[in-house]
Amino acid sequence: MDDFAYNLRRAETGVLLLADDLTVTAVSPGALSLLGLDKPGALLGRPILDLHPPPLRPKVAVLLKTARGPSGPAATAVLSLRGGPVLIRASALTGQGETAFALVLTAVGESRETKEGPSARPAPPGYLRKVPLGLGETTEFVDTAGVIYLEADGHYSRVHTAFGHSFCPLALAELERRLDPDQFLRVHRSYIVALAHVRAFRKRESGGLLVMDTGAGDLVPIGRAQVTRLRGLLAI
């Protein structure tokens, strides 16, 4: 078997079904993975164009328009999605139900597992791998692995690392949404911590305190609503 056929057989594939108004009516587990999503609720009932960033929407619209054409050919395009480059093949459907399109998604290119080996554990698709620092003409970055905790700073935030703290132009709510929830947890309305950098837990009457792995052993408060969840994650 040649390399192309071998890679094609191993490539991750998924399927999306769309109604005539281009809302998603069904999704396969493979499609969720390729789109960098965990649950179908994030897709079902939503217009397919709204699920893509603005620069990609015209390309998706042309893809569907071509598939809907008089000759009804399957239309193809390669898009860079959160899970990586994906070949999308769109076909118009005819039937009694509400489904009007089938989109077949196939991962293209070498997988990270192939490049780095099966033991590598990449960050889930769509999550930040670096956090931006500073404001102005130059933006620097810190790897998420180096982030110890994040603190709200008005409409922005402050990133704490082993080397001190720096301004981040992203709001804490956006960071919560874009960081891997297996690695980061919002423990208080003003704080997100990297679970790998929690040094100790201190009880107190209301909530608790986390001792973080900084030189000074910074203390981060825990909101009462997060105490039970945090105890489970830290096995305490």
From Swiss-Prot:
InterPro entries according to UniProt? LytR-like, LytTR_DNA-bd_dom, PAS, PAS-like_dom_sf
Q: Where do the annotations place heme binding?
A: H52
Q: Write the protein's name.
A: CO-responsive transcriptional regulator RcoM
The GO biological-process annotations, alphabetized, read as:
nitrogen fixation; positive regulation of DNA-templated transcription; regulation of nitrogen utilization
Organism placement in taxonomy: Bacteria, Pseudomonadati, Pseudomonadota, Alphaproteobacteria, Rhodospirillales
Name of the gene encoding the protein in the UniProt record:
rcoM
Domain named HTH LytTR-type: which ranges? 131-236
Domain comment in the entry: The N-terminal sensor (heme-containing) domain is covalently linked to the C-terminal, DNA-binding response domain.
Which cofactors are required for activity?
A: heme
Biological function:
Activates the expression of the CowN protein in response to carbon monoxide (CO). Is required to sustain N(2)-dependent growth in the presence of low levels of carbon monoxide (CO).
Identify the Pfam families for this entry.
Answer: LytTR
Q: Where is the PAS domain?
A: 1-64
Instruction: Name its species.
Output: Rhodospirillum rubrum (strain ATCC 11170 / ATH 1.1.1 / DSM 467 / LMG 4362 / NCIMB 8255 / S1)
Recorded GO MF terms: DNA binding; metal ion binding; phosphorelay response regulator activity
Cofactor note, please?
Binds 1 heme group per subunit.
Keywords, A to Z, come to: Activator, DNA-binding, Heme, Iron, Metal-binding, Nitrogen fixation, Transcription, Transcription regulation
Null allele phenotype? Strains lacking this gene are not able to grow with N(2) as a nitrogen source in the presence of CO.
